[in-house]
Every structure is written in structure tokens, then in C-alpha cells.
Amino acid sequence: MFERFLEKINYEKRSVSGVDDFFAELNGKSFLNGLYRIFRKDQIGKWTTIVEEAFPNYKGTIEVFGFDWMGQVFAMRKDTNTVLWFQPGTGDVLDIPDDFVEFHDTEIVDYPEDALVSRYFDDWFENNGHYILKHSECVGYKIPLYLNGEDDLNNLEVSDMEVYWGVMSPLISL
């Protein structure tokens, strides 16, 4: 399992036996210069709560597992076992009709632009001296799109992810 994803991230192991093995191997790791990251196991409960506070309609129905360079969080829906994509900079939640394995082996591998906004990351990475984000950092909007911020590189800044979510969460419901 996860062969395509592991190849994409150039991981030394080319297969893991299941979701539990995936987390045992990749717990807290960052991939592709910070484009995609897996939460540390000890942070999953905390981040599930943070996301649920920002998006209260999902309280008790999700468990987070990963996030991208823009601080957008991916979570599993407990009722359907499919992926939800929580976007603090836009206030949107997108339903990705894939399970955990399909999300990694198909969405991230075949559709990185759709799943991780990878071209925008490449532009940002190039314009910021190939800065590799720390696991606790994200690139967020200075002015969120739902407050008429521009969707361009000049409106982005590196932030501590927990601070970014703390600032954006109350604004999402405006």
C-alpha cells in the first residue's frame, strides 16, 4: 500500500502494510520541501479540536491526519471514511471522495495542483529563496480571501500554523 505516494516523496521504503504502518513510518514528517506534512501522533487530538472550533459543523465527525504548506488541514470523515480539506484562508471545506489510501496514492500523486496547490507553492518557494518550512510553519494569507484579500504572492507570509489558525478561526464565521 501507498507505493505511489512513497515513490512520489522519494521515501526509502517503497511500501507500508496499512494505515497504522503509514503513521508509524511517517508520523510527523514533512515532504517535498514542506508542501505536504503528516501531523505528529501526539498532535492529532489537539489539531482535530482546533479545526472543529473553526468549523463547528464538523465537531465530533472528523480526525485530522495531515496538512499542506498553506496550513490547510486534511481530515477523515468518521461516517464516510473519506477526506475533508479545511481551508482557513478561504473559510472553505472541500469534500474529497477518496479514502486515506486513495488520497495519498491518487490525489497527491496524480493531481498535486488540485490536492496541494503545488504550482502556487513552486512560485512561492522560488520567490522565497527555497525556504523550507518548519513543521510548525505554514504560508498564510496576510488578508484572508473572505475579507477581500488578494490571491497572490504579495499577500502571503510565513506564520506559525497554530497562530495562523488562531487568527483565522474567528474570522471564518464573519
Locate predicted features.
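A surface-exposed partner-binding patch
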Residues: 1-83, 139-174
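Short secondary-structure junctions and interdomain/linker hinges
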Residues: 29-30, 58, 72, 107-114, ...
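Bulky hydrophobic/aromatic packing residues
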Residues: 35, 92-94, 127
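Charge-rich, low-complexity amphipathic helices
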Residues: 41-45, 87, 105, 125-126
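Short, highly charged low-complexity linear segments
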Residues: 79-82, 96, 103-106, 122-137
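Compact, glycine/acidic-enriched structural inserts
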Residues: 84-119
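Mixed-charge (acidic/basic) macromolecular-recognition segments
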Residues: 112-155
